[in-house]
């Protein structure tokens, strides 16, 4: 059960990041998706989705590696 939960924790932010990359790519090529009225709004939303997904993924990996004591001294808790 815990492995399934860990997989979901990694897949959901990964999908959000992938959506962000897709929105930024569509903005670059000038394709507007339905809920967005302007390209700049679509590009900004894509960047925000990508940043949030990457933040959650990186935080989860750092938390897991800290727990296993596999990080460099600079990232260890004080």
UniProtKB/Swiss-Prot annotation:
Taxonomic classification: Bacteria, Bacillati, Bacillota, Bacilli, Bacillales
Pfam families reported in the protein's UniProt record: DUF2627 (PF11118)
Keywords of the record: Cell membrane, Membrane, Transmembrane, Transmembrane helix
Protein name: Uncharacterized protein YqzF
Membrane spanning stretches: 5-24, 39-61
Membrane topology: Multi-pass membrane protein
InterPro entries for the chain: Uncharacterised_YqzF (IPR020138)
Protein localization: Cell membrane
Example of a GO cellular component annotation carried by this entry: plasma membrane
